[in-house]
């Protein structure tokens, strides 16, 4: 009996603009394809062997004659291209309305309330790149002790503070207060703690980021699996994205390699259910920073670890490699891109060389996991279990 699914989110590894990408300002975006074009190819032999290059319409990765796994790609139904929207849809939620964004900064009354409740003035209150705003306001923050508030094209309120000026505990408390305030009409998908270290002109963000999300708007496959007595293990920022809902055990990570190490540790344990891992570096370190060289290197570093991941699996495990949105590092701006996500599925019980085509929703992943674990579904998406299992 199959009783465990390992789900790897390669954060932002999109594989081509969705049909509605123009509405999101993302015509021509192709995270994987454009990195390959700009950087003279990407060497991903292990993902290639599993079927990555055999996905319909993929650019930059050559197909192999007999891929070992099943493969396909998926459209996004929900109205958005952010982390929360993507992960929630993967887990079985369709969002008709996009989360609210604040491209011109947050309302004055909101900022005033945050300042009153945290007992500090704040800096910033505008849309900005996280690294640029540290260069601009980091020195003033060091001098005044005022946290830096900023946003992006996503539905986020981000709060940056130097770890020697505002302790991590206090920064997390400040973010918790902001989360309570940013509800109702002003609800953003996430409040993000952005701690940093260093000196003026040489600031750098630390891995101690923490996200404070909204509760999912309905039951996810995680909630259902937990209720049915399965383990739901969250590696990386998964716990934050779901606000802890439907999770039985969670561990945070410092980078992709740490995420892979911790996932392998969990695979080798006697658990059953879902191991749900987010590898965030592709997005946070290279996508937003428009660094195709770094992105390529990070993809190749993951690929080198694939044999080790697969060797740790049990005979009845199913592993799915996918993404949550795009973030084309060759594209204009510094924000996510509305793209297809890849689906590469492997296991001893998975039929080799199986093309599952273009899926109509990321929620097909949730439906398939429900089917594999034989638990009730979220009633979103269509299972591809019968297409892939021997």
Swiss-Prot record:
Cytoplasm: is it a keyword of this entry?
Answer: yes
Could you confirm whether the keyword Metal-binding appears in this record? Answer: yes
Q: A GO molecular-function term, please?
A: manganese ion binding
UniProt record, GO biological process: 2-deoxyribose 1-phosphate catabolic process; 5-phosphoribose 1-diphosphate biosynthetic process; metabolic compound salvage; nucleotide metabolic process
> Which prosthetic group or cofactor does it need?
Mn(2+)
Q: Keywords assigned by UniProt? A: Cytoplasm, Isomerase, Manganese, Metal-binding
Cell compartments where the protein resides: Cytoplasm
State the EC number(s).
5.4.2.7
Main location, first listed in the record: cytoplasm
Q: In which pathway does it act?
A: Carbohydrate degradation; 2-deoxy-D-ribose 1-phosphate degradation; D-glyceraldehyde 3-phosphate and acetaldehyde from 2-deoxy-alpha-D-ribose 1-phosphate: step 1/2
Per the UniProt entry, the disulfide pairs are none
Gene3D superfamilies hit by this protein: Alkaline Phosphatase, subunit A, Phosphopentomutase
Residues noted as binding Mn(2+) 2 in the record, renumbered to the chain: 283, 288, 336
A single Gene Ontology CC annotation of this entry is: cytosol
- Pfam families under this entry? Metalloenzyme (PF01676)
Report the SUPFAM superfamilies cross-referenced here.
Answer: Alkaline phosphatase-like, DeoB insert domain-like
- The entry marks the following residues as binding Mn(2+) 1, namely 11, 324-325
Query: What does the function comment of this entry state?
Result: Isomerase that catalyzes the conversion of deoxy-ribose 1-phosphate (dRib-1-P) and ribose 1-phosphate (Rib-1-P) to deoxy-ribose 5-phosphate (dRib-5-P) and ribose 5-phosphate (Rib-5-P), respectively.
Q: Which family does it belong to?
A: Belongs to the phosphopentomutase family.
Q: Could you tell me what this protein is called?
A: Phosphopentomutase
- Organism of derivation: Alkaliphilus oremlandii (strain OhILAs)
The root-end lineage is: Bacteria, Bacillati, Bacillota, Clostridia, Peptostreptococcales
